[in-house]
Curated annotation (Swiss-Prot):
<dbReference type="InterPro" id="IPR015915">
    <property type="entry name" value="Kelch-typ_b-propeller"/>
</dbReference>
<dbReference type="InterPro" id="IPR005174">
    <property type="entry name" value="KIB1-4_b-propeller"/>
</dbReference>
<feature type="repeat" description="Kelch 3">
    <location>
        <begin position="342"/>
        <end position="390"/>
    </location>
</feature>
<dbReference type="Pfam" id="PF03478">
    <property type="entry name" value="Beta-prop_KIB1-4"/>
</dbReference>
<feature type="compositionally biased region" description="Polar residues">
    <location>
        <begin position="19"/>
        <end position="30"/>
    </location>
</feature>
<protein>
    <recommendedName>
        <fullName>F-box/kelch-repeat protein At5g15710</fullName>
    </recommendedName>
</protein>
<keyword id="KW-0880">Kelch repeat</keyword>
<feature type="compositionally biased region" description="Polar residues">
    <location>
        <begin position="51"/>
        <end position="70"/>
    </location>
</feature>
<feature type="domain" description="F-box">
    <location>
        <begin position="101"/>
        <end position="146"/>
    </location>
</feature>
<feature type="region of interest" description="Disordered">
    <location>
        <begin position="19"/>
        <end position="79"/>
    </location>
</feature>
<feature type="repeat" description="Kelch 2">
    <location>
        <begin position="298"/>
        <end position="339"/>
    </location>
</feature>
<keyword id="KW-0677">Repeat</keyword>
<dbReference type="InterPro" id="IPR001810">
    <property type="entry name" value="F-box_dom"/>
</dbReference>
<feature type="repeat" description="Kelch 1">
    <location>
        <begin position="201"/>
        <end position="245"/>
    </location>
</feature>
<dbReference type="InterPro" id="IPR036047">
    <property type="entry name" value="F-box-like_dom_sf"/>
</dbReference>
<dbReference type="Pfam" id="PF00646">
    <property type="entry name" value="F-box"/>
</dbReference>
<dbReference type="InterPro" id="IPR050796">
    <property type="entry name" value="SCF_F-box_component"/>
</dbReference>
Length: 448
């Protein structure tokens, strides 16, 4: 009967979603973005599948509800993950669907697991509270098998920060659902401070445990983590993590830091051997940024002397220089990895605040040169960076590029393929010490 009660709730919610359209999130909407590209405050119902299209005029991208009387905000605290806010509209209430005991009480386990595997990952935490058996659903091999074969939920933004007294906080913004979710992060050790990045459902952190530089990998949805063995050289390094889903393994690459010892060899951790291996020392170069980009089994860094890029081949463990000169008057630049072999350079151009602009280039591997592919519209640039001296952060995944600045409580998202700019707002982006990266929620990503 516990299962039956949940299916009545689940099916009734789906029916309501189909009849009344999708609800909108109550995260603060950016007012200076034009209506054709604003996505900051729209919410797709968490019961709707990833990538589903919103056909409701109120929930369609680019529309805003400007009438306060049409919207009623209801604070909620769902079980497990806490959804920030939910906005409900005065529409016709549909009665709960009546379920037949003889059908739903005898649902085969394999069919049940296949259905649950298609539920958005953040809803699984609510499902776990239905009964003791479902509380162990994440350890069920049958469920994990179905989950691994289902298409990805879609890209998310993971923000991490620490409140006083150093309590870790984490929120995830689902781009398909247009909703913020809070994830408990108290399972992390206190020394985990720097967010290295995310890949394939895993998130990597580093920090100083006393005088020892340590690295850990965790799965936020599974609340599981483990500390990696110590590197051969105990010094803070630039790190990047890559996951290979085909053999369920991951690697962490440690290179020379922009301010660190340049004579240290490159180290690579392989989860299959649980060891760090030593590789070629990066040739003597003057790095101009601590940001790295990984695509097509290659790691890229920016260099000033010699001018261009340093590329590390993960398969051979060798470094080589690429003489790709940067665009003229480039003030600051970030390397961003796209899909397949695409490598982007994002940065500001200009000498004075009135002449500055944000541009995006793509590396032409054949001609070894940067080709401009897009420019940030002036209104977005002025809203993102109100002062010419303001710093910004930039990161990307799957041809999506996200911009954040230190004095803004919102992020700017650019879709390279669709050429669409859109704002992302929410309380998780308002913390001055928050660290952000793209994140793919997965239950089958193992830290072992």
């Amino acid at each position: 009967m516990e299962r039956l009660g949940f299916w009545g709730l689940l099916m009734g919610s789906v029916e309501k979603s189909l009849d009344s359209g999708n609800s909108l999130a109550c995260s603060a909407s950016a007012k200076n973005g034009d209506e054709e590209s604003s996505t900051s405050s729209k919410q797709v119902s968490p019961l709707k599948g990833s990538g589903s299209r919103n056909t409701s005029p109120l929930g369609r991208v680019g529309s805003r509800n400007t009438s306060p009387s049409r919207q009623k905000v209801v604070k909620t605290k769902p079980r497990g993950l806490e959804e920030e806010t939910v906005a409900s509209f005065g529409k016709q209430v549909v009665a709960d669907v009546q379920m037949e005991d003889g059908i739903w009480a005898m649902l085969p386990e394999d069919l049940l697991n296949e259905i649950l595997a298609r539920v958005p990952p953040f809803m699984i935490f609510r499902i776990r509270s239905v009964c003791k058996k479902w509380n162990l659903i994440l350890q069920d091999n049958s469920f994990l098998k179905f989950h691994s074969n289902v298409s990805s939920h879609g890209p998310c933004l993971l923000t991490f920060w620490k409140n006083s007294p150093q309590i870790p906080q984490c929120s995830v913004f689902s781009l398909p659902l247009k909703t913020w979710y809070k994830i408990p992060f108290t399972f992390l050790p206190p020394w985990a401070f720097w967010l290295v990045g995310s890949s394939g459902g895993l998130v990597c952190f580093s920090g100083l445990d006393g005088l020892t530089f340590r690295t850990l990998v965790c799965n936020p949805l599974m609340q599981s983590w483990r500390t990696l063995p110590s590197m051969h050289y105990n010094q803070q390094r630039q790190l990047i993590m890559v996951v290979d889903r085909s053999d369920k393994s991951f690697k962490v690459i440690a290179t020379s830091d922009i301010y660190g010892d340049k004579s240290l060899p490159t180290e690579v951790y392989d989860s299959k051997t649980d060891k760090w291996s030593l590789h070629q020392i990066m040739p003597a170069v003057n790095l101009c940024s601590s940001k790295m980009a990984y695509c097509d089994s290659r790691l890229y860094l920016e260099t000033l002397s010699p001018l261009g890029l340093m590329m590390y081949r993960l398969d051979s463990g060798q470094w080589e220089h690429i003489p790709a000169k940067f665009p003229r008057s480039l003030l600051d630049g970030y390397l961003v990895a796209g899909t397949q072999k695409r490598l982007f350079l994002v940065g500001r151009i200009g000498l004075y605040s009135t002449l500055q602009s944000m541009r995006i280039w793509e590396l032409d591997h054949t001609k070894v040169s940067w080709v401009e592919i897009s420019r940030m519209p002036p209104k977005y640039f002025r809203a993102l960076l109100r002062l010419s001296a303001e710093r910004f952060e930039c990161f990307g995944q799957d041809n999506l590029i996200c911009f954040t600045s230190w004095n803004q409580g919102k992020g700017l998202l650019y879709n390279v393929d669709k050429k669409i700019w859109s704002w992302i707002s929410g309380c998780a982006l308002q913390s001055c010490n928050s660290q952000v990266c793209f994140y793919e929620p997965r239950f089958d990503a193992s830290v072992l």
